[in-house]
């Protein structure tokens, strides 16, 4: 971990946004939002990492996640999640791009204020995380097994800084 004083709060934010209990959005749905925004930002590392985590959280295979990334409107997900992904896509373009009609539609599809809030926060946070990762030219393995192992570990352990550092250290030794 390059700077624990910055990595620790960033990991803590990811823990709250993506892993901790949520009143209504499952961890898999939140990971899909993170993966979707990362894909829109063309952040390979974050897209692949959070896609693998979503796969494990949803007890699915990667094909569902890939469908969401390619075309959320055609993916076999709830209308509410599709509406939340539309909001996330608008945030990715810029916060002021979120339209009142998108919020109204999400509410019509059953989204609560906390789900809308957290979708905006996840999308905004991942715009920052993606730029941070890409801006530092973060090491990015081109090995699906790496991402799959990391995904399974994040599901078990969350985003604690110590477990993230251990994962990357172990994977570097075996790659």
Question: What positions do the PLM features span?
Answer:
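Hydrophobic alpha-helical segments
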Residues: 1-175
């Amino acid at each position: 971990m390059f700077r624990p004083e910055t990595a620790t709060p960033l990991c803590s934010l990811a823990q709250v946004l993506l892993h901790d209990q949520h009143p209504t959005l499952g961890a898999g749905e939140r990971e899909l939002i993170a993966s979707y925004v990362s894909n829109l930002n063309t952040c390979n590392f974050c897209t692949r990492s959070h896609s693998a985590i979503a796969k494990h959280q949803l007890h699915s295979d990667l094909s569902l996640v890939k469908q969401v990334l390619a075309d959320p409107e055609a993916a076999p997900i709830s209308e509410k999640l599709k509406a939340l992904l539309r909001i996330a896509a608008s945030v990715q373009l810029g916060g002021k791009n979120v339209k009142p009609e998108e919020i109204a539609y999400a509410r019509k599809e059953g989204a609560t204020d906390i789900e809308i809030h957290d979708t905006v926060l996840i999308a905004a946070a991942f715009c920052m995380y993606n730029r941070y990762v890409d801006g530092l030219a973060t090491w990015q393995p081109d090995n699906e097994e790496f991402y799959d192992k990391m995904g399974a570990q994040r599901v078990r352990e969350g985003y604690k800084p110590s477990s993230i550092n251990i994962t990357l250290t172990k994977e570097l030794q075996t790659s």
